[in-house]
Amino acid sequence: MPAMSQNPPLLRPDLAPAPIFDTSRREGQPTIGMVSLGCPKALVDSERILTRLRAEGYAISPDYKGAGAVIVNTCGFLDSAKAESLQAIGEALAENGKVIVTGCLGAEPEYITGAHPSVLAVTGPQQYEQVLDAVHHAVPPSPDPFVDLLPASGVKLTPRHYSYLKISEGCNHACKFCIIPDMRGKLVSRPAHAVIREAEKLVEAGVRELLVISQDTSAYGLDRKFATERGHRAHITDLARDLGQLGAWVRLHYVYPYPHVRDLIPLMAAHGESGGLVLPYLDIPFQHAHPDVLKRMARPAAAARTLDEIAAWRAVCPDITLRSTFIVGYPGETEAEFQTLLDWLDEAQLDRVGCFQYENVKGARANDLPDHVPDDVKQDRWDRFMQKAQAISEAKLAAKVGHRIEVIVDAVDGDGATCRTKADAPEIDGNLFIDEGFEDLAPGDIVSVTVDEAGEYDLWGRL
């Protein structure tokens, strides 16, 4: 059997060297092959993919015959490079039959599948997770005593009972105060089945709460045209419903107030066929309320519409908790515009609020806007805003006194148990404290408590 093709020597002057693989393996170990084409940057991508696969227990095969499947990391820089990539894919299909395509030419999936419709998967450049997921599907990993030292959930920097679940990278918006699109690019959504697979592994490892994050959660799947792959549709409503079936709390963050967010609310309501699958909690970055400020920010929302949306959400799910963040002192913000924000907050009655004083960020377009607000004025507006937000929070928490609610335990020490309600995300929201009868509790426990006391941001209760 022929060895797998390597880079021809004269394709381009910036060509990467032919990869050298460590091909040692144990009996029964799953194997994968790699054909790496193109420039040194592509070679680094191949190295990263192979590093992840080796860490998961895969061996690297030096030839087609010994590989359970073959990854072809393509180049699409020139027409000649595209032709070489198609040729390499065809060779891998002929010699092995199971081929996963990635790399620059993967950004044109129809071009590849038009020539080779039998490839298992096509992913774009730097889409490492999608490549790994395709490998797992084609060549399932097997247990290895050394690999098993790594927790099933991976290396996490959060407590074992909750985990952040990233569903996409990048953002399609062009907010003038933000440089995220410049740093992370346009929206790139993970396949829904890959998200679900990660979530399943987390829950199996003991995670009780999944915190769904991205730059724009409600836009999830837009770049994938909301496609259905392996039984899961890449749309936030479908994804939330699927995640809600796993038995863990599901909390949604960074949700822009698009009209289709209304479809999420029935999943949060206590009643209905799909009710209770998702926590009644939405983290929505409104940023401001005055239409002129929003326009200067280049934000994709208007204050009047958001009030209508809030009313519609609460009509379906009266217990919904709404969290948001705001910027005061944005360039050009007048006292009248700020007062509009205060009036809007009075009407919106948000449960959880964060506020930032505007600061220039290197590379942000807002830096060049006229009429920057003096620091002392920004501080005064922040103080007034937070005073109003605090009063709203205190009143809403006071209304919970005497009620029986469900909480998740975050920590237990000699003084008591620190918990969170369904209305509280870790780190950014409040807590519920239990001072008596907590000795048998452990982090990750979900228990019912009676609320005895309320403060500005926190609650106290008893089992």
UniProtKB/Swiss-Prot annotation:
Its cofactor is [4Fe-4S] cluster. Keywords: 4Fe-4S, Cytoplasm, Iron, Iron-sulfur, Metal-binding, S-adenosyl-L-methionine, Transferase. InterPro entries: Elp3/MiaA/NifB-like_rSAM, Methylthiotransferase, Methylthiotransferase_N, Methylthiotransferase_N_sf, NA-bd_OB-fold, Ribosomal_uS12_MeSTrfase_RimO, rSAM, rSAM_horseshoe. It is found in: Cytoplasm. One of its GO terms (molecular function) is aspartic acid methylthiotransferase activity. Its EC number is 2.8.4.4. [4Fe-4S] cluster 1 binds at C39, C75, C104. The keyword Zinc does not apply. Coiled coil: none annotated. Signal peptide: none annotated. Its main location: cytoplasm. GO terms for biological process: tRNA modification. Catalyzes the methylthiolation of an aspartic acid residue of ribosomal protein uS12. Belongs to the methylthiotransferase family. RimO subfamily. This is Ribosomal protein uS12 methylthiotransferase RimO. It comes from Paracoccus denitrificans (strain Pd 1222).
